[in-house]
């Protein structure tokens, strides 16, 4: 886990290898970016499959780095048994009920995947950390169904609910069309109704991202206390060549 953390920072630093004397590069921001403050554990598959996740989280925190863990909720026992919790735990609630969940998410190995998601949501009120339910909303598929979403959100009682419109990019284009993208006004309409059903309000929104944040109040992220510094000879990651598999 420690090597994974260091390699992540090295990869981050490689992205910052720019001409720092160029007038378009704010030197103060470039210097600040040399010492990362946040890490998102997402996008590379389901992170709760990593058997040493707690150790990785603790290493991040000891270096003063906050952790944002995104899970699909398929492994509630892992969440329950984490010795170290992330700074913020996102649970992807991508469908309002089992029927739509099975159609959209297409679980391959577990016919009870939606029940596992519900078990994860039941855990959230007992976790001493920031929690978020994230809804990625697909027009004509999972958008709407406010009562079903509210039932799940009320079980989880998260600090925040994030309503995000589906974006027609990547491999999802094989399963959806551009008509499945909700507009920002549609996201706001959904969020207003969901906020009312969950005793919350719309705290913020971003038109460019077609996203709204629902909650009771804005609560800033507090960085973990920094106990360890990065090695002085850390260096940067070597260049990598990645090739997408041919379809």
What residues fall within each predicted segment?
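Conserved AdoMet/S-adenosylmethionine-binding subsite of the radical SAM
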Residues: 12-185, 189, 193
């Amino acid at each position: 886990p420690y090597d994974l953390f260091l390699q992540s920072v090295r990869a981050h630093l490689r992205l910052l290898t720019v001409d720092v004397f160029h007038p378009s590069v704010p030197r103060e921001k470039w210097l600040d970016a040399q010492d990362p403050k946040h890490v998102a554990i997402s996008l590379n598959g389901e992170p709760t499959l990593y058997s040493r996740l707690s150790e990785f989280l603790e290493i991040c925190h000891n270096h003063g780095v906050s952790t944002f863990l995104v899970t699909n909720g398929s492994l509630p026992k892992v969440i329950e048994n984490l010795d170290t919790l992330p700074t913020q735990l996102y649970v992807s609630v991508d469908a309002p009920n089992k029927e739509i969940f099975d159609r959209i998410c297409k679980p391959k190995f577990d016919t009870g995947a939606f029940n596992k998601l519900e078990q994860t949501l039941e855990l959230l009120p007992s976790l001493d950390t920031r929690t978020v339910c994230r809804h990625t909303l697909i027009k004509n598929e999972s958008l709407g169904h406010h009562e079903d979403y509210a039932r799940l959100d009320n079980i989880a009682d998260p600090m925040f609910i994030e309503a995000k419109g589906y974006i027609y990019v990547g491999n999802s284009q094989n399963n959806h069309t551009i008509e499945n993208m909700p507009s920002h006004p549609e996201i706001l309409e959904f969020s207003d109704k969901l906020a009312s059903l969950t005793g919350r309000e719309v705290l913020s929104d971003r038109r460019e991202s077609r996203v709204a944040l629902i909650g009771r109040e804005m609560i800033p992220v507090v960085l973990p206390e920094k106990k360890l510094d990065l090695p002085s000879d850390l260096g940067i990651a070597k260049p990598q060549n990645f090739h997408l598999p041919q379809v």
